[in-house]
Every structure is written in structure tokens, then in C-alpha cells.
Amino acid sequence: MPLKLAIVGRPNVGKSTLFNRLVGKKIALVDDQPGVTRDRKMADGRLASLPLSLIDTAGFDNVNDDSLEARMRAQTEAAIAEADLVLFLVDARVGVTPEDETFAGLLRKANIPVVLAANKAEGRAGEAGVFDAFRLGFGEPVGLSAEHGEGMAELYESIRNALGPEAYERALEEAEPDYERGAGEDILEKLAHIDIEDTTLSDDDLVAAIEAADIDADVAEAPVQSDRPIRLAIVGRPNAGKSTLINQLLQSDRMLTGPEAGITRDSITVNWEWEGRQIRLVDTAGLRRKNKVQERLERMSTAETIRSLKYADIVALVMDAHEAMEKQDLQIADLALREGRGVVLVISKWDTVEDTDGAARHIRDLANRLMPNAGGAPVVFLSGLTGRNIEKLMPAVVKVYKDWTARAKTGDLNRWLRHTVEHHPPPSVQGKRIKPRYMAQMKARPPTFVLIASRGDQMPEGYKRYLVNGIREAFDMHGVPIRLFVRQGKNPYAGKVGADGPPRHKRRNN
């Protein structure tokens, strides 16, 4: 694991700006308003040759009650305890404040290496603030500008000196290896020349390309990438119980929670292991209707949540048991499915429901009726607060992930297609039959299929949905979006023996 570096300091000294610079992209929300960061946020970054596991923390306030600020302080203290090295940031333009001095006292008691940096050190006012920071007792401060990238070389040297030669070399040796080409990428690369959106491509060429690619053989040869973490995003409306659910899963107060709606602002990522399987949990800010997203900061949080959803594998949509399946829930589910993510429906606060049997039947009925595109997504009824039924969530997530990554063998797929068309053929258009001829799965994540059919451009949307639902049931792909592209053209077997239809397909022996 890379060196764990916690960036700490009072509110609005530039911690998240420095965090984003070291990560190399904008992950933490940044705003002039103090207290933007509330949870501790983690990401991998780099400073020169030194790989880092960075922890961005909430601003440190000197409070001791049960307020939101006190809980934010507890998250910061947890980050300090977890880190190998602390980067203590002060504002050079303001100078040392009583809050900075209190924080310095806390760090001295923590018995952990500390690097002191004075941010916003541009200009004469900044120079005076750097000099003032000497009195905090952590040696020579590093003057820097996180916004403009100034002082990074000096920061690197200070971190290296604080670690010492042995710890520094160990940090370099224990860094994770660079990204390796994942299994399955070769398959997609072989199919890259097949543009299923290209309506100028003849069916003969498309069918030939599909068969030449020998998809089933490639899939059989490709090793299962079991070490790849499942990226699970926890999404939902504000105060639905998302952070409480993650804390219950992790068995720790990793996420800041409380009765106030909208506590989580950033998308917080936590690496976790469940029954030997690596999981990357992402807690997100609550999504509201657009007309209720008024503050600039909340708009930034909403955009960050949508970005996290787009990069997830599976989305757990958390809904309050007493307010489930409202319009905003349906819109979030629709967004996840349109982005090609697998979906698990989570009904939280189940410990507060009296008639659980009746409520469960009602919610499942609503899900089937109002979320037809979710395709029978599993529904898990649980309580993040008490842990009731919490053990049912991850098996449902892993099952949907397997469906999301599943592939149907081409032979099985076409046998199913022939049987389906024989029993329920597509309707005629202007007295002329539509003849589905050949189907292949082009990719997984999500499962994507192409169907070759005469007059395919005239196939009714209702029949396409019928085929998608049939694929879902026949190949057990529930809770995941299924994409079907229909292409038209002449009979690819015309002029051959048995030209009135496609030949029988045999299962490949892999």
C-alpha cells in the first residue's frame, strides 16, 4: 500500500484544493464557503516519484458537543490515527489562529510525523504568514500555493525528510503496480471494427464479422478477473440512510451521519473486503429534484454524485421505507439504467415498519409496475441502524454483478431466438413479415446484443421489449439493463441451400 498521508487543518485553508492537485483531478469539492468537506475522503495520488494514499479531512473546529461540527472533528481525528504521516495546513494570508494552535497540540499528542505547510503563500502577506507558522513547533513550514501548484518540490523534500531514509524507500517499494491490461479487453478490441450503429454495413459483413470474431472461444479462454473490485455506489435522496448503511456494512463510524439531511457532500470512496471479494464502496450526496437544488455547493454535490454513478458497476438505490418509489427514486433508477449500471433496490429503516409483510408486497408491486426497465431488480428490506437483514444486501449485489458481466453463448442464444420467434413471431408490417435471423452478444457490462432481421428497421418497439424481457428470463439477467440493436438487410443465406432461413447453430466446444 502507498504511504497514507492525511491533509488536516482548520476550515477553508485549502485542504481539498491541495488534495485535488496531488490526486491529479478534481475529486474533492472546493468552495470559498468554510466546511465544504465533512467526511474524510480517500484517493491515490502522487508527489514527484512518491505514490501516496491521500486522505482529505473536514476542517478542524474546537468543539466538544454532539453537533455536526463535533462529528466532523471525530472524522478528522480518525484520519490522523489511520495515517502514516500528517500534512498540517495553515492559511499564510491569515497567519496562525487559536484554532491552529489547538490543532497543533492535538497533533503533538498523536505521536505521528507531521509536515507543516502554509498555503496561499503568494505575495508579501503570504511570506509573513509562513514565518508566523514557525511558532507552531513543527520546524520550518513549507510555503506553497495549492491553487497554482507552487512549492510542490519543497513539499516533496519535507515529506521525504519527515519519513527518514528507510521509511521513504519502503514507501516506494510498497507502491501498487501500474494498471495491467484487464481480461476481456482483447475481446472488445477484436470487435472494435464492428460498428453496430453503422447502418451502411451489410448483414453479410456483420454476420461474417461476428462469426469470425469467435466470441465464445475468446470468452472461454479469458480468465476471470476475480481480483477486480466491484464498484458499488450507494445513491438515493437526502437522508434515506445511505451513510448509516455503509457504517453498518463496515462495522465502523466511517461515514458522518446524523438527523440533518444532506450531511454527505462529496462522494466518499472506501475499499472493503466482503467474503474474500474486494468491494469499492462509494457513499454519495443525496439527489434532489432540480428545482430544489439551489445552492452552488449543492449543485456541485449533485454533479459529483452523478459522476460517481456513471463510474459504478452496481448502484444500490436506497429508499426510506415510508417514502419509497417516489418520482425522484424512479428518476435515479432510470439514470442508473440509462448509464448501463446494474441496480439493487434497498428499502431502509425497515425497523420502523409495523406491517412488514404488507409493506413488502406493496413495494415489490410498485417496483414491478413503476420500474419495468429495472428488469426484476432484487429488493432488499433492511435497517442500517440496527443491522436487520444487512446480511442480505451483498449477496444481492454480487448476483446482479454476475448478471451484469454475464455472456450468453451464441449457439444457446440463437436456439432461444428460433424457439421464441416460432411461438411469437413479430407482427407483419404492411403485409410483409419481419424475419429475425441471427443474434449475438457483442459485449457485457451491460449485456449488449445485435439482432439481424429482414426489415429490422420496421420492428416495433414493443416486440424489441418482448425480446429483451425474453433474454432476461432465459439467461437470468435480472436487475441489469439489456441493450438490443436491430439491424436489417437481405437474407445473408440467400443463394445457399436452405436459404429460407438460418441453419441450425451448434454449441461450440470450448
UniProtKB/Swiss-Prot annotation:
Keywords, alphabetical: GTP-binding, Nucleotide-binding, Repeat, Ribosome biogenesis
InterPro entries linked to this entry: G_ENGA, GTP-bd, GTPase_Der, KH_dom-like, KH_dom-like_a/b, P-loop_NTPase, Small_GTP-bd
Regions annotated as coiled coil: none
UniProt key word Nucleotide-binding: yes
Domain KH-like: 406-490
GO molecular function: GTP binding
Binding-site positions, GTP 1: 9-16, 56-60, 119-122
Domain EngA-type G as annotated: residue spans: 3-167, 230-405
CDD domains: EngA1 (cd01894), EngA2 (cd01895)
Record keyword GTP-binding present: yes
Family: Belongs to the TRAFAC class TrmE-Era-EngA-EngB-Septin-like GTPase superfamily. EngA (Der) GTPase family.
Quaternary structure and interacting proteins, as annotated: Associates with the 50S ribosomal subunit.
Stated role: GTPase that plays an essential role in the late steps of ribosome biogenesis.
Record-linked HAMAP family: GTPase_Der (MF_00195)
Name used for this protein in its record: GTPase Der
Organism: Hyphomonas neptunium (strain ATCC 15444)
Lineage of producing organism: Bacteria, Pseudomonadati, Pseudomonadota, Alphaproteobacteria, Hyphomonadales
